[in-house]
Amino acid sequence: MRVPVSWLREYVALPAEATARELADKLISLGLEVETVEEVGADISGPIVVGRVLTIEELTGFKKPIRFCTVDVGDANGTGEPQGIICGARNFAEGDLVVVSLPGAVLPGGFAISARKTYGRMSEGMICSASELGLWEDHEGIIVLPEGFAEPGTKADDLLGLRESVLDIAVTPDRGYALSLRGIAREVAAAYGVEFTDPAVRPLPSAAEGGYPASVADPAICSRYVLRGVTGFDPAAPTPLWMRRRLHLCGVRSISLAVDITNYVMLELGQPLHAWDRSTLRGPIEVRLARPGEKLETLDHVVRALDPDDILITDESGPINIAGVMGGLSTEIRETSTDILIEAAHFDAAHIARTSRRHQLSSESSRRFERGVDTDIQLAAATRAVELLAELGGATIEDGITHIDHTVPREPIVVRAGHAGRVAGVDYPVETEIARLRQVGCEVVQEGDTLKVTPPSWRPDLTDPNDLAEEVIRNEGYENIPALLPQAPPGRGLTRGQRLRRAVGRTLADRGFFEVLNYPFVGVRDFDRLRLDEDDARRTAVRLANPLNDDEPLLRTTLLPGLFKALVRNVGRGFTDIALFEMGLVYHPKPDAPAKAPILPVDRAPTAEERATLEAALPEQPRHIGAVLAGQRLRSGWWGGGEPATWADAIHTAKEAASVAGVELIVRAAQYAPWHPGRCAALYVADGDREVLVGHAGELHPRVIKAYGLPSRTSALEIDWDRIEAAAAAATAPQISTYPVATQDVALVVDASVPAAEVEAALREGAGELLESVRLFDVYTGDQVGEGRKSLAYALRLRAHDRTLTVEETNRIKDAAVAAAAERTGAVLRG
C-alpha cells in the first residue's frame, strides 16, 4: 500500500515538522512493515510556473509540426514580458493555462532547462507534459490546466504536488484495514496521539428504499449489499489533476473519471467498489454462487469457466461480475455511459480468496476482500462515490438506495483485566488497557476484574484476548518492554522421547541422509499416485477448511508424498545420488470426532471438560520416520565401481533407526502400496507373544516411480516411531560379554522366490540364544546355483556370557541354524 503523506495529513493533525522518515519509524514501532520511503520529485528544482498561452505561430519547413508560442508567465521571468517557447504538442490553444519550466529549472532525471536557439527561434523554457514533470504517464501532450486554476506566474510545483513523500507499506494478511488511507491514518493518529478525522463519517441518507432491485441468495456469502445510482453523468468529464496525481502516487493507473472515482474511494476508505453502465443491466441483480457450466468474459477479455464456489453478481442475462475479484466485459463503463450504478458490498473473505487463487486473478479488490473489509462502511463508500460523480462529472444522485443488511453483531470478547500485562511481562494499569483498546476503535465495558471488549467493524482480525493484548502492547510500544532474560524453571532436561528422536536423527545423518521438513499438506492425487486402494485407511484424511492450495486440501496420512517431491526437486538440481529422511507427524481423523474443534480461552486455564472436548476433536497424530534413497550409495572411483542404493539399504536403514531405541525389527515379506510387491518388507516389533506392525520398507513400485518422476529403482521406508518408542519402553540394557566372539559364515541356496528375511528368521531360531547377530552380506544368482535359484551368504556372530565358545559348540550352533533354515525354507548348504 503506497501512502502519500500529503493525503494522510488531510485526516491526521500531524505536526508540521514531522518528516516521512519519522512517520515510517512510528508505523514500524506499531508493527507495520514500511518497506521504503520514496521522495518523489526530490530532483526537481528551479522555476516551474503557471503560464497562459498568448499566441501560437505555426512554423513550416520542418519534418514535423512545430509551434512558436508566446506565454505569459507573470513576473516569474523577472521582466514581466511574455516568454517565447518552441513546442511540438498540438493539444492546446491560445488562451489555455499551461505549466512552464523556465531556464534554470531541473526536471526529473536531471533534465536541465535552458534558453537555446532551435528551429530558427530562441526558446526560453519548456511547456511541460505530465510525464515530463513526473506526475503520471501521459502521451496525450502537454498539461492543459482548468480555467481559474491559478494566475500566470504562480509557482506550479506545490499546486501540482510535484514533490511528495510516499510510504510503501507491506500489509500483512491480518491487517486488511491498513490497505486504505483511513486505516493508516488511524494508526498514525494513535502513534502521535493527535486527532483523527474519519473520512467515513459523513451525513448518510436515512431512507433505503426505491433503489435498483437486488437480492442476496445466501447471507453467508454476502452480509451487506448496497447500490446507489446517478443519472446524467458527463462521460467526457476529465479526472481532475489532483485525483490523477494521487492515484498515480498510489500506483493506480487513471482510466476514466467514473472508474477513477471508484479506485479513489477504495484507496481512501478501503472499500472496493464496482461501477456498471446501468443501460447494460437486464433486470434485477442477484448475488449467488455459480452454477455448473456457467461462464463469464471478464474485463481482461478472458472467458472464464466458473466454479460452484465462486460468488457471482448476476442479472436476467446471467453472470455479470465475479464478485470481489473482477467485473464482466458486457457491463463495463464505456465512453458513452451516462447512467451509472455503484456497488458496495461485504463478501465472504474465504470465498474471495479461493476464487482469486482458482482463476489466478489477484486484483486490488480481491486483496482487500480476502483480508477482510469493514462490515459497516458500504453505504458511506457508495455515498462518497456518487457525491464525487455529481461534483466532478455533473451527475444527478438518485434518491433510491438498495441496502441489504444481513450483518450479525459481533460478540464481545471477555478478557481479564491486566491480561496484556501478563502477556508482555509489564504492569499496565487497567486504565491504560482500556484507553489503548478504545484508541483502536474497540468498545470496552469494565465489569469487576473483567473487560467486555467489542472489536470495531474494520478489525476482523481481533478474535480473542491475545489479539487484544497485542493491540495494547504495540500501542504502548514494543520498545518499552524491558529486556529481561526469563528465569528458566528447574527441569530434568530433555525427555526420553526427545533424546531418542535426536539420537535417531544423528544416526541417519551419520549414514549420509539429509533431513527435510515438508509441508503436511497432500491431495487426493497423491493417494492416486501412491496406488492406494479405495478402502485404504490412508485415504481417510483430515480436510482443511481454508487450505493454502486447493490441490492439497488434506493433512498427510503418510510422509512419502512430501519426500518424493523433495527428491524430485533435488534430482532436478543435479543431486542424483541422494538420501533424504523426515521425522514428522501424520494425521488420522477419529471416527467419532466432532465436526468442529472448540476454541479454548487464552486468558485462563481451560477446564478439564474443555480440554477433553478439544482432545476428542483433534485427529490422531502419530510420529513417523520416512526416508527415500536414489542413485548410488557408494560412488565409483579409482577404488572401483559404485554400488547402487537398493531395497536392502532401505530395510537396513529402518533396522538401524529402530536399534537406536534398543528395538530389533522383525522383517517379513509383504505386498503393500506404494512398494514393489516382490521387493517389499513389512517391519514388526515383538510384543510378548505377538508381533506389532510398525512400518514397511523396500523398492517402490515402477508405476509409482513413473507417476512422481523419481529415479528408477528408488527405495523408501516409513515406520511408526511412536510404536517403536512404546516397544522400547520395557527394554533393558543388554548383558555385555567380555568373552571373544566366534564367527561362522554360511551360504544357503534357496528358490529365487524365497524372501531373505524368512531365511534369516529361520537361522535366528535355529541358532538359539548364543547368536548375537546375523547379517546378509552376499546374494548370488548364476549358473553355479541353477536357474530359478539364488545363494544367500550370512555372517553369524556367536558369543557366550560365561565362557569362550569352542569350535565344537560353534559348529553345532551353525548346523542347527542351517537345519532350521532347510526345514522352513528348503535351503541347501552351498558347497
UniProtKB/Swiss-Prot annotation:
Record-listed Mg(2+) binding positions: 461, 467, 470-471
SUPFAM superfamilies hit by this protein: Anticodon-binding domain of PheRS, Class II aaRS and biotin synthetases, Nucleic acid-binding proteins, PheT/TilS domain, Putative DNA-binding domain
Gene3D superfamilies: 3.30.56.10, Bira Bifunctional Protein, Domain 2, Ferrodoxin-fold anticodon-binding domain, Nucleic acid-binding proteins, Phenylalanyl-trna Synthetase, Chain B, domain 3
Family membership: Belongs to the phenylalanyl-tRNA synthetase beta subunit family. Type 1 subfamily.
MF annotations from Gene Ontology: ATP binding; magnesium ion binding; phenylalanine-tRNA ligase activity; tRNA binding
Gene symbol of the encoding locus: pheT
Lineage: Bacteria, Bacillati, Actinomycetota, Actinomycetes, Streptosporangiales
One GO cellular component term noted in the UniProt record for this chain: phenylalanine-tRNA ligase complex
GO biological process, one term: phenylalanyl-tRNA aminoacylation
Domain FDX-ACB: 737-830
Catalyses which reaction(s): tRNA(Phe) + L-phenylalanine + ATP = L-phenylalanyl-tRNA(Phe) + AMP + diphosphate + H(+)
InterPro entries: aa-tRNA-synth_II/BPL/LPL, B3/B4_tRNA-bd, DNA-bd_dom_put_sf, Fdx_antiC-bd, Fdx_antiC-bd_sf, NA-bd_OB-fold, Phe-tRNA-ligase_IIc_bsu, Phe-tRNA-ligase_IIc_bsu_bact
Protein's UniProt keywords contain DNA repair: no
Oligomer and partners: Tetramer of two alpha and two beta subunits.
Record's protein name: Phenylalanine--tRNA ligase beta subunit
